């Protein structure tokens, strides 16, 4: 006679307690491998200042390669980046090539306001825009020629008048009146016909710049090739001088400027630069690409990882590796525990029930056979 036994309860903790202990392993590893205090690295970039910039390569970086810049050490829109083995205050400004000169508070002239801000970032000193246009030069050395000697009012008037010479013109102080001199030589410039904004065709961009200087008005490149009316002009005067008479009118146009010798590429060059702007220069037969930040290469097809990303050092790489191992162990342990609970226990119950059912079935058959024999 087979005695009926109650089915054994699934002791999931007994089956999986070894795996559950593994869940404590990540916590133990994190406690043992806690980050070292940032004591070997400088707390500010002021300790890294050199005559040529900010360089922190002289500090011990073997223990930790993490560095945070504060607003007092990398100011004026600068960005602190780790490039190679150095931590430097980098001034990455995407300044265009437009010629809109400004005069800075340090007495220097800049191509446009963007270059002024870039210089302030590199020098880590404040540079303000004093006036539009190039900085004024001294009207005289003090010796005088009898005309302007001792006359501060006349000297100031002449200096302010010379300031309005724009578009590459220079002020000729030796002339009887104020003259703007255009010392632009286009004899060595290659032939590259262009259509300008004044509706005339020029042999190259240098002639457009020369015409803009002599007329003292803004003339831009509109398209490659000659204009539809094929009007060609050369604007070289005999003495290279241009007299300014409309001082008041042009004083309000100091923000206008002549562009550099780079012009946009024609439409059939669409897609020539993958991540940048296509430009055509008079000194090159083929167009060139001005890549966006983070890209390099002839067609801006390569990523500049040295700028966009910081290469982790050995200590940080060790932490990353430990974190990856911990994550893998956690996933494995969770999977094993889930499989243990959902499959191991129900399977044991099914096997036990099958054995019980088989025992009862055999007893019933034996009883029926004995009854028939009687």
From Swiss-Prot:
Residues 1-39 form the signal peptide. Disulfide bonds join 91-121, 95-114, 103-135, 182-213, 186-206, 195-227, 265-278, 273-289, 291-300. Keywords: Disulfide bond, EGF-like domain, Glycoprotein, Membrane, Proteoglycan, Repeat, Signal, Transmembrane, Transmembrane helix. Residues 40-320 are extracellular. GO terms for cellular component: extracellular region; membrane. It is a single-pass type I membrane protein. The record marks 97-98, 188-189 as: Reactive bond. Glycans are attached at residue 55. Residues 356-374 have a biased composition (Polar residues). The keyword S-adenosyl-L-methionine does not apply. It comes from the Eukaryota. It is found in: Membrane. The keyword Signal applies. May be a survival factor for hippocampal and mesencephalic neurons. The shedded form may up-regulate cell proliferation. This is Tomoregulin-2. The gene is TMEFF2.
């Amino acid at each position: 006679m087979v005695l009926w036994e109650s089915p054994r309860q699934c002791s999931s903790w007994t089956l999986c307690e070894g795996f559950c202990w593994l869940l404590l392993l990540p916590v133990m590893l994190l406690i043992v491998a806690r980050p070292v205090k940032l004591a070997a690295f400088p707390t500010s970039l002021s300790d890294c200042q050199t005559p040529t910039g900010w360089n922190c390569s002289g500090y011990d970086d073997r223990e930790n390669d993490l560095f945070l810049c504060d607003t007092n050490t990398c100011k004026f829109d600068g960005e602190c980046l780790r490039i190679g083995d150095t931590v430097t205050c980098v001034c990455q400004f995407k300044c265009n090539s437009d010629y809109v000169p400004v005069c800075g508070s340090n007495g220097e002239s800049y191509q446009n306001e963007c270059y002024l801000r870039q210089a302030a970032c590199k020098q880590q000193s404040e540079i303000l825009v004093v006036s539009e246009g190039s900085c004024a030069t001294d009207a005289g050395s003090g010796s005088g020629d009898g005309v302007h000697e001792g006359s501060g009012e006349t000297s100031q008037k002449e200096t302010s008048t010379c300031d309005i010479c724009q578009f590459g013109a220079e002020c000729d102080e030796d002339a009887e009146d104020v003259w703007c001199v255009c010392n632009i030589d286009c004899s060595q410039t290659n032939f590259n016909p262009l259509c300008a904004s004044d509706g005339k065709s020029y042999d190259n961009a240098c002639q457009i710049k020369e015409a803009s200087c002599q007329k003292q008005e803004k003339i831009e490149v509109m398209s490659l090739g000659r204009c539809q009316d094929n009007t060609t002009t050369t604007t070289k005067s005999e003495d290279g001088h241009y007299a300014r008479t409309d001082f008041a009118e042009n004083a309000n146009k100091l923000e206008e400027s002549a562009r550099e010798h780079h012009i946009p590429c024609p439409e059939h060059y669409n897609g020539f630069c993958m991540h940048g702007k296509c430009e055509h220069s008079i000194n090159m037969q083929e167009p060139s690409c001005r890549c966006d930040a983070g890209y390099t290469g002839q067609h801006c097809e390569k990523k500049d990882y040295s700028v966009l990303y910081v290469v982790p050092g050995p200590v940080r790489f060790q932490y990353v590796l430990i974190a990856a191992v911990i994550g893998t162990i956690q996933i494995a342990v969770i999977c094993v525990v889930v499989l243990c609970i959902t499959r191991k226990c129900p399977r044991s119950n099914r096997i036990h029930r099958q054995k019980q059912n088989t025992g009862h079935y055999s007893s019933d058959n034996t009883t029926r056979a004995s009854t028939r024999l009687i």
